[in-house]
């Protein structure tokens, strides 16, 4: 019974507690927002930490000791809520799928039993304990949140405090600045001065920077302009130099062709004033060398004479021959500056009275005319000269360009030109051979007249061949003369080019005429063969002479093909090639073989053997050294003053003068040497100097030096001259500055015996017919008989060449960038 009595109050109490807890839960729902979130925390971890047997008794004892009912109610309410949560938690754990451990189950049962069957004191004590723990947790959470809030506040306040401290510092600074009004004014003044100084400094820096920019830009612009100007000047200079070189080259080439084809030597051609009578006379003389009967010309007319230098005159005149101005049948040849020397050598005065002329001239008159022409040569080109004074003791007035020779009126023949051309550059005044006139219309004419008369006397039908042909109109001659009359000839290139074009037209007409007469060379060749073969001493010489026929006519046994050593000079490139091969400017002309009449120009050939090198390798001239640059002009001056002076004497004078010159005087010539060497190196980068071997001549089986050979040839020529010209005044052939003789016919002096045809020492023409010269080289050739170079040493050019080759004068192997065809040009 006791057990039942003991359990009944517990049950009643439990029912009362359940009702109380229900009431508390309803209140909690009403006061839901007032409860702290921490009160809803589960209590099972706290209750697990304490022994279950002690929880309820302590809770009951705590409730009994608490006198405040409100606190008890609040604690009970919390306890009930916690118990409800605990029961729900246990129910959740019981309904979970995970199996429960046996101890946990027993433990939970004990807790439930203790909770269900504990006394109220125990329950109150446990509630108080729970409240304490909750308070402790709340405090901990509050402290944690306060710490977090304090850290955030510190972060926020740190900025505020910094600003406050900065304000404080500035206020302190302002407090320091604050002072007496004088100090403030002084400080303000200092600040204003500093500000103005800084502003001025900034402006100065900006201005200096701008100036530097402008200066740099201006300097760059100036440099660019200077570079552009220098480049333009260099280009212009290069173009001008190239044009000058091309023009000089063309003029030289045309001059050579014109001189050769037009039979015109480079004379000092007088330019007559614009007088129709004079022009008509010149045109008539150009075509026939005779005045028509209706035109009169007074030789005593005084007119200013204007001289053209020989190099330009030959290119401009393009084949004009000396004006043979005649009145009726009176000849008017042009005087030669070396007439005195020629007359001395022949022991005769140039006295036309031998032919019945009305005028006689002694040596004094010739000297005066010679001096007058020398003086005229000193005048600059294009300058006007007054008329030359007449000799005081002359019977009649004399033209300043020549001596008037008269012939017998009863003579049925015409007077042949008795002159040598005015060549101030001829380096030697050797006696010229007599050459009669031969008509191109009678190529097979007998060379030896039956009568013992003068070789200048020929039948009436023989006339001097006109260089431009009789069919050339009178208008072209007048045009050329009028173009030559221009005083600005040398300042106007158009005039020169016009004259050159006229010369080309003449050349084309000459070619057409020669093509219409193809039998001319055959006739000349037959006459030459008759003459040469009859004089050949040995069979070897006869065979060699016979072999010259196909070569001279341009015909070959191999279907017109020429050998490797034959060059066609009608093509400009071949002419240039031969110019480069021949070692010196003087030698270029000596290899030209131009037929004077009958044959076509296409038959002009060069026959030459290579000199110590392969035949295909052209000869490259050495660049001129400083001495040669200086001597070129000095030699020209000496020749103008002394045309008869020999080249060896001129070279000795130049050598002594060069040695006496100071280095300062030589400096510009060394600079020119460096420039020429640079040009030569650019043009021939692989050039290597190969000196030419010394030549010796084999005559009659003996080796002779050049001096001995020249003496032997001189004596033999003198013998032949005396044999053929006994009692006769020799006729002078027309010679050019190129060293090639172009007479109108074959002379007696060139019909020498066979050595002339077989001379291996001749470097120029050695043919009886000078219009068809044969070039032979001395290298690799032998000779059986004596040799006589007919025209070899007649011309002064050959003397110079011999001196160049054998007396160590280096001029012959030197070249300049603007070489003239002549060895030494007068202008």
Swiss-Prot record:
There is a cross-link at residues 404, 417 (Glycyl lysine isopeptide (Lys-Gly) (interchain with G-Cter in SUMO)). It comes from the Eukaryota. The modification Phosphoserine is found at residues 399, 439, 442. Residues 184-262 form a coiled coil. Residues 25-34, 341-357 have a biased composition (Basic and acidic residues). SMART domains: HMG. Highly expressed in testis. Induction: Expression is dependent on SOX9. The keyword Ribonucleoprotein does not apply. Disruption phenotype: Newborn mice display mild skeletal abnormalities. Knockout mice also display increase in prematurely differentiated oligodendrocyte precursor cells in the motor neuron progenitor domain of the spinal tube at 11.5 dpc. At 18.5 dpc the number and distribution of oligodendroglia are normal, however there is an increased number of differentiating oligodendrocytes. Its main location: nucleus. Keywords: Activator, Coiled coil, Cytoplasm, Developmental protein, Differentiation, DNA-binding, Isopeptide bond, Nucleus, Phosphoprotein, Repressor, Transcription, Transcription regulation, Ubl conjugation. GO terms for cellular component: cytoplasm; nucleus; transcription regulator complex. The modification Phosphothreonine is found at residues 119, 401. Transcription factor that plays a key role in several developmental processes, including neurogenesis, chondrocytes differentiation and cartilage formation. Specifically binds the 5'-AACAAT-3' DNA motif present in enhancers and super-enhancers and promotes expression of genes important for chondrogenesis. Required for overt chondrogenesis when condensed prechondrocytes differentiate into early stage chondrocytes: SOX5 and SOX6 cooperatively bind with SOX9 on active enhancers and super-enhancers associated with cartilage-specific genes, and thereby potentiate SOX9's ability to transactivate. Homodimer. Interacts with DAZAP2. May interact with CENPK. This is Transcription factor SOX-6. The lineage of its organism: Eukaryota, Metazoa, Chordata, Craniata, Vertebrata.
């Amino acid at each position: 019974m006791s057990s039942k009595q003991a359990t009944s109050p517990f049950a009643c109490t439990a029912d009362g507690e359940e009702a109380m807890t229900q009431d508390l839960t309803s209140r909690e729902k009403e006061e839901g927002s007032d409860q702290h979130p921490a009160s809803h925390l589960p209590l099972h971890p706290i209750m697990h930490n304490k022994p279950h047997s002690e929880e309820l008794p302590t809770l009951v004892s705590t409730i009994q000791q608490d006198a405040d009912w409100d606190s008890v109610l609040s604690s009970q309410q919390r306890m009930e809520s916690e118990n409800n949560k605990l029961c729900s938690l246990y129910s959740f754990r019981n309904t979970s799928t995970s199996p429960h451990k046996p101890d946990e189950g027993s433990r939970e049962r004990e807790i439930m039993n203790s909770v269900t069957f504990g006394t109220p004191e125990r329950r109150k004590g446990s509630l108080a304990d729970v409240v304490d723990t909750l308070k402790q947790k709340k405090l901990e959470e509050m402290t944690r949140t306060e710490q977090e809030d304090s850290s955030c506040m510190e972060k926020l306040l740190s900025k505020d405090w910094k600003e406050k401290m900065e304000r404080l510092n500035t206020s302190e600074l302002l407090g320091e600045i604050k002072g007496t009004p004088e100090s403030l004014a002084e400080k303000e003044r200092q600040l204003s001065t500093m500000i103005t100084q800084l502003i001025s400094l900034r402006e100065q820096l900006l201005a200096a920077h701008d100036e530097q920019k402008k200066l740099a830009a201006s300097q760059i612009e100036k440099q660019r302009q200077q570079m552009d100007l220098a480049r333009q000047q260099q280009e212009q200079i290069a173009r001008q130099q190239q044009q000058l070189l091309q023009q000089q080259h063309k003029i030289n080439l045309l001059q050579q062709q014109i001189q050769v084809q037009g039979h015109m030597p480079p004379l000092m051609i007088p330019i007559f004033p614009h007088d129709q009578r004079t022009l008509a006379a010149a045109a008539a003389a150009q075509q026939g060398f005779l005045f028509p009967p209706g035109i009169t010309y007074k030789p005593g007319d005084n007119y200013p004479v204007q001289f053209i230098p020989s190099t330009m005159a030959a290119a401009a005149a393009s084949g004009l021959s000396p004006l043979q101005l005649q009145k009726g049948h009176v000849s008017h040849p042009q005087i030669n500056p070396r007439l005195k020397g020629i007359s001395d050598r022949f022991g005769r005065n140039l006295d036309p009275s031998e032919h019945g002329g009305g005028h006689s001239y002694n040596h004094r008159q010739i000297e005066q005319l010679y001096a007058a022409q020398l003086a005229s040569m000193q005048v600059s080109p294009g300058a006007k000269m007054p008329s030359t004074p007449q000799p005081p003791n002359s019977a009649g007035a004399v033209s300043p360009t020549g001596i008037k020779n008269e012939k017998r009126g009863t003579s049925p023949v015409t007077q042949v030109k008795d002159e040598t051309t005015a060549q101030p550059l001829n380096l030697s005044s050797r006696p010229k051979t007599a050459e009669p006139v031969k008509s191109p219309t009678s190529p097979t004419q007998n060379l030896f007249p039956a009568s013992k008369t003068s070789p200048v006397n020929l039948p009436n039908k023989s006339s001097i061949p006109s260089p431009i042909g009789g069919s050339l109109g009178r208008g072209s001659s007048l045009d050329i003369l009028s173009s030559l009359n221009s005083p600005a000839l040398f300042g106007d290139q158009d005039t020169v080019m016009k004259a050159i074009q006229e010369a080309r037209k003449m050349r084309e007409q000459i070619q057409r005429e020669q093509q219409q007469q193809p039998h001319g060379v055959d006739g000349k060749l037959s006459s030459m063969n008759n003459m040469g073969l009859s004089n050949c001493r040995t069979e070897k010489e006869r065979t060699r002479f016979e072999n010259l026929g196909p070569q001279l006519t341009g015909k070959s046994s191999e279907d017109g093909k020429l050998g490797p050593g034959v060059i066609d000079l009608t093509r400009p490139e071949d002419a240039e090639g031969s110019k480069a091969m021949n070692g010196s400017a003087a030698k270029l002309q000596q290899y030209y073989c131009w037929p004077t009449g009958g044959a076509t120009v296409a038959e002009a050939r060069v026959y030459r053997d290579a000199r110590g090198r392969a035949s295909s390798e052209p000869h490259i001239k050495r660049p001129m050294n400083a001495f040669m640059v200086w001597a070129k002009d000095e030699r020209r001056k000496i020749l103008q003053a002394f045309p008869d002076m020999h080249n060896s004497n001129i070279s000795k004078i130049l050598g002594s003068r060069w040695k006496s010159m100071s280095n300062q005087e030589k400096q510009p010539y060394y600079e020119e040497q460096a420039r020429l060497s640079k040009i030569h190196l650019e043009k021939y980068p692989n050039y290597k100097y190969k000196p030419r071997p010394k030549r010796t001549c084999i005559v009659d089986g003996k080796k002779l030096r050049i001096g001995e050979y020249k003496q032997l040839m001189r004596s033999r020529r003198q013998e032949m001259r005396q044999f053929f010209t006994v009692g006769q005044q020799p006729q002078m052939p027309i010679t050019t500055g190129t060293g090639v003789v172009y007479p109108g016919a074959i002379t007696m002096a060139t019909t020498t015996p066979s050595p002339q045809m077989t001379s291996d020492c001749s470097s120029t023409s050695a043919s009886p017919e000078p219009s068809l010269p044969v070039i032979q080289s001395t290298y690799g050739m032998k000779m059986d008989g004596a040799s006589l170079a007919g025209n070899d040493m007649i011309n002064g050019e050959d003397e110079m060449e011999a001196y160049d080759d054998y007396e160590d004068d280096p001029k012959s192997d030197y070249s300049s960038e603007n070489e003239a065809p002549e060895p030494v040009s007068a202008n």
